[in-house]
Amino acid sequence: MNRNEILFDRAKAIIPGGVNSPVRAFGSVGGVPRFIKKAEGAYVWDENGTRYTDYVGSWGPAIVGHAHPEVVEAVREAALGGLSFGAPTEGEIAIAEQIAKIMPSVERLRLVSSGTEATMTAIRLARGFTGRDKIIKFEGCYHGHSDSLLVKAGSGLLTFGNPSSAGVPADFTKHTLVLEYNNIAQLEEAFAQSGNDIACVILEPFVGNMNLVRPTEAFVKALRELTEKHGAVLIYDEVMTGFRVALGGAQSLHGIMPDLTTMGKVIGGGMPLAAFGGRKDIMECISPLGGVYQAGTLSGNPIAVAAGLKTLEIIRREGFYENLTARTEQLVQGFRTAADAAGIEFTADSVGGMFGLYFAAHAPRNYADMARSNIDAFKRFFHGMLDRGIAFGPSAYEAGFVSAAHTPELIDETVAVAVEVFKAMAA
C-alpha cells in the first residue's frame, strides 16, 4: 500500500470523506487522491515522492507558480511581524487601492477570507441596497456554499429553485430563480414577470465550474441592459476569473462595468483572501456605514495581504498576460491536434490562463451541453495523464489553469504525453 492509500484511509477515520473539500476525494473519477507534500513552480509532489506537472494550480490561485520566491519572502517578512491582529493595517489599504486601480468598477472594496464570504455578502448587500428579495443565478454557476446559492433549477421554466444540498431549508431558496446560462429569452421573461422584485443577478462571467463556458456577447449585453432598466444589481463573480483571464478580469474583456464584483483566489497569492467591491453608493450600505452587516476576525489577514500584494505586483509586469495566454493556447491547441490525430471526439477552449477540455464535438454553451459530454472519456484521460505524471482537476466539470511557471518546453512535454493517452484511448 502506497502513502496516498495509507493517508486516505487514515483521513477517512477522522475527516468526513477523508477530505476538506469534496472534489478532492476523486469521487467523480475514481481512485485514490494524491496527498501533496510540496509544490514548486509548475510541479507538485505527492507523499510517495512522485512529481506531477500541475494544471490544477490550487484551483486557480497559483498564477505565478507554486512557492514563487518573491511571494514566499513577502509572506516570511510579514509573518515575522505577527500573524494576525484583528485591527486595521496599511497593507489592507494598499491592496484595496491596487485592485481599484486595476478594476475601474471597484470604487470601494471590503476584504474577507473566502469566496463564499464574498458572494454571500454581495447578495446580502444587493438585497439591502434595493430592498428586494429575489435573486437570479444560472444553472452550473457556482458561487460558494452559502444557503441561498446552493440551488438547482426548479421543475419548470422560471420556477424558483430547489435546495441542492441537504440542510438547506426550502424557504432559504424560494427567492432564487435559476436560469439557463446564455439564454436571453429566459432572462427577459424573468424580468418581465418579476423585474420589480429582483435584487440582483449573479453570474460567473466565464464559467469555471462547468469546465469553461463562455458567455455570448449578446447575453452579456442583455444582462447589463436588463439589470439597469429594472434597478437590479449586476454581480460579476470573478473569484475564479479575476486576474486569471486578464489583468482586469472578465469585465475588462467584456467591456462591462458590473455594480458589484466578487474576487478571490489570485488576490491572495495562495493564501486565504477574497474581496467584494463595486459602486460607492452600494458599498456604503455595508456596516459600519450602513445597515447591512458583515464582519470577520481574520478579514484582511496581514500574511494573506502580503502574499496578495506581491502577486499583484508580479502579474502587472510587462508581458505577463501575453505569455500566460500564449502558453495556455499552446496547450489547448496541442491537445486538439493530438485528439484529432487519434480520432477522439474532443475540443478545448481557453481564455487567459484558464482552459477547458471537453470530450464533445463542440464547446458547451450551458450546463445541459456540458452534461451531454463524454464524462467516461474524461475519466480515462484524467487517469492516463495522472499515471504519466500530469495532474488535472479530478472532475470533468472543473476548468484547468496554466501558470507563469509553465514554460513552452513543459507545455510541449505535456502535449506529448497527451498524444500517448489519446492513442491508448483510441486503441
Swiss-Prot record:
Belongs to the class-III pyridoxal-phosphate-dependent aminotransferase family. HemL subfamily. Its EC number is 5.4.3.8. One of its GO terms (cellular component) is cytoplasm. It comes from Neisseria meningitidis serogroup C (strain 053442). InterPro entries: 4pyrrol_synth_GluAld_NH2Trfase (IPR004639), Aminotrans_3 (IPR005814), Aminotrans_3_PPA_site (IPR049704), PyrdxlP-dep_Trfase (IPR015424), PyrdxlP-dep_Trfase_major (IPR015421), PyrdxlP-dep_Trfase_small (IPR015422). The modification N6-(pyridoxal phosphate)lysine is found at K265. The lineage of its organism: Bacteria, Pseudomonadati, Pseudomonadota, Betaproteobacteria, Neisseriales. Homodimer. It is found in: Cytoplasm. Keywords: Cytoplasm, Isomerase, Porphyrin biosynthesis, Pyridoxal phosphate. One of its GO terms (biological process) is protoporphyrinogen IX biosynthetic process. CDD domains: OAT_like. It catalyses: (S)-4-amino-5-oxopentanoate = 5-aminolevulinate. GO terms for molecular function: glutamate-1-semialdehyde 2,1-aminomutase activity; pyridoxal phosphate binding; transaminase activity. Pathway: Porphyrin-containing compound metabolism; protoporphyrin-IX biosynthesis; 5-aminolevulinate from L-glutamyl-tRNA(Glu): step 2/2. Gene3D superfamilies: Aspartate Aminotransferase, domain 1, Type I PLP-dependent aspartate aminotransferase-like (Major domain). The gene is hemL. The keyword Lyase does not apply. Its cofactor is pyridoxal 5'-phosphate. This is Glutamate-1-semialdehyde 2,1-aminomutase.
